[in-house]
Regions:
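Acidic, glycine-rich active-site loops and adjacent beta-strand->loop/helix elements
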Residues: 51-52, 80
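Short, solvent-exposed coil/turn linker segments
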Residues: 89-91, 343
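Domain-length cofactor-binding catalytic modules of enzymes
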Residues: 2-31, 40-47, 53-59, 63, ...
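N-terminal cap/recognition module
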Residues: 68-75, 80-88
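Interhelical loops and loop-helix junctions of multi-pass membrane transporters/channels
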Residues: 127-131
Length: 411
């Protein structure tokens, strides 16, 4: 762990889990320094080893705030996170079983792609959602923000859908040769609209009350003891619950497809175990260094001592199931993935579609994607080396499972 602290420029220090300060983009460090100058920042800022420039706040960044929430420090994909389940099916069965449509793994990937809406698509009819039903039953909690109410209705069409960008569904292989299922998704357009809406309100409030936080930081904030702050917390919690349910429903759909196809072609019924579902974009009230503070994790996972969590790699690389070590200086946090080395545009300029597809074939990875033209955006070369990230956070988490991509569905 490194510490960066210029007392002439910063109110609190920045603690960083990289090999060198030079491993961090200049713009990312600048954003972290902005965080370190916020008057309500508590004790220090933490940067995980996958950190890179975000909107206002670095991805892979953690800030604990006194009596304050920052919509941009949560981000617009509120509640984005991971889900995982272990199976007892050997991967060689998926690769060696040949069907009329090719290897069984290809059939499973194809069925997932046809069943789960990806990218901007959604279901043609409303889905069941206990989270949204509950919100409807207590709608008075949300009526003050009438502009957002329509997104509750629209959310019914997105429950159990993947999205695009770095979201994925993977069939993976553990070190014992067994198949696993992992997915990455969030609150879809629902959380996006909530994040944008309250970021705008925070801007307006900060202007109205002559905030000392420079507007160019892009970190407008809401005191939690205001009506606006409480409304944001209500909506944020709703988006987090929606994101959790979205992953839960999607995982059940993928398990159903996996079971159906494995039974159909092998006669074997899979068993499932060790299910995990966790957020990596959110704020939570926690106690650190003797104070109750709002801990914002933007692209970072809670890693309390003994807590089991998911750290995915990039498409075609390794992923990890980890156990947290409860490091106080990281605010009980670790990285949420590998972290980008290239922007999406930069990756497409640097790596061709052909080179990415060749790499996936060489690694024996089956790709399910409706359009390959933007595949370079999410290739493993666009991201940091996940094994280096894991090494740099060896005091934050202990790996308990190492996983390898077998098949992947992307938006």
């Amino acid at each position: 762990m490194l510490e960066y602290y210029d007392k002439d420029k910063m109110l609190v220090p920045i603690k960083i889990w990289t090999e060198s300060i030079d491993d961090i983009e200049e713009s990312c460090l600048e954003q972290a320094i902005n965080l370190a100058n916020l008057p309500f920042a508590h004790d220090h800022i933490a940067l995980m080893p996958d950190t890179h420039t975000g909107k206002g706040m670095p991805i892979g960044g953690v800030i604990a705030c006194k009596n304050t929430v920052i919509p941009n420090a949560v981000g617009v994909d509120i509640g984005c996170g991971m889900a995982f389940v272990q199976t007892d099916i050997p991967v060689n069965i998926l690769r060696d079983t040949v069907t009329g449509s090719g290897e069984l793994i290809k059939v499973i990937v194809g069925n997932i792609l046809r069943t789960i809406p990806v990218g901007f698509s959604h279901y043609g009819k409303p889905q069941t959602s206990a989270v949204l039903d509950k919100a409807q039953s207590e709608i008075e909690r949300y009526n003050a923000d009438s502009e957002l109410l329509k997104f509750i209705e629209q959310g019914y069409y997105s429950v159990g859908s993947l999205g695009g960008g770095n979201h994925f569904i993977e069939i993976q292989e553990d070190e014992n040769g067994m198949a696993c299922i992992m997915l990455h998704s969030g609150s879809r357009m629902f959380g996006n609209m909530i994040g944008q809406y309250f970021n705008k309100i925070a801007h307006e409030m900060n202007d109205k009350y002559f905030s000392t936080v420079p507007s160019e930081y892009n970190l407008p904030f809401l005191p939690v003891d205001t009506d606006e702050g409480q409304r944001y917390l209500n909506w944020m919690k709703l988006a987090m619950d929606f994101a959790f349910e979205n992953r839960e429903v999607m995982l059940e759909k993928v398990k159903h497809i996996f079971t159906e196809q494995v039974e159909k072609y092998t006669g074997i019924t899979p068993n499932y175990s060790d299910e995990i579902n966790c957020h990596h974009n959110y704020a939570a009230l926690e106690n650190h260094y003797g104070e109750n503070v709002w801990v914002h994790r933007k692209g970072a996972i809670h890693a309390a001592e003994g807590e089991v969590a998911i750290i995915p790699g990039s498409m075609g690389s390794n992923s990890y199931i980890v156990r947290g070590m409860g490091k106080a200086e990281s605010f009980l946090t670790s990285s949420h993935g590998a972290g980008r080395n290239y922007s999406r545009t930069g990756a497409k300029e640097k790596f061709s579609v052909e080179s990415v597809m060749v790499d996936l074939r060489q690694r024996n990875v089956v790709l399910g994607k409706t359009s390959k033209k933007d595949v370079a955006e999410e290739c493993r070369f666009a991201y940091k080396d996940i094994d280096v990230v894991m090494k740099n956070q060896s005091e934050l988490t202990t790996p308990i499972k190492k996983l390898f991509t077998v098949g992947v569905v992307k938006g």
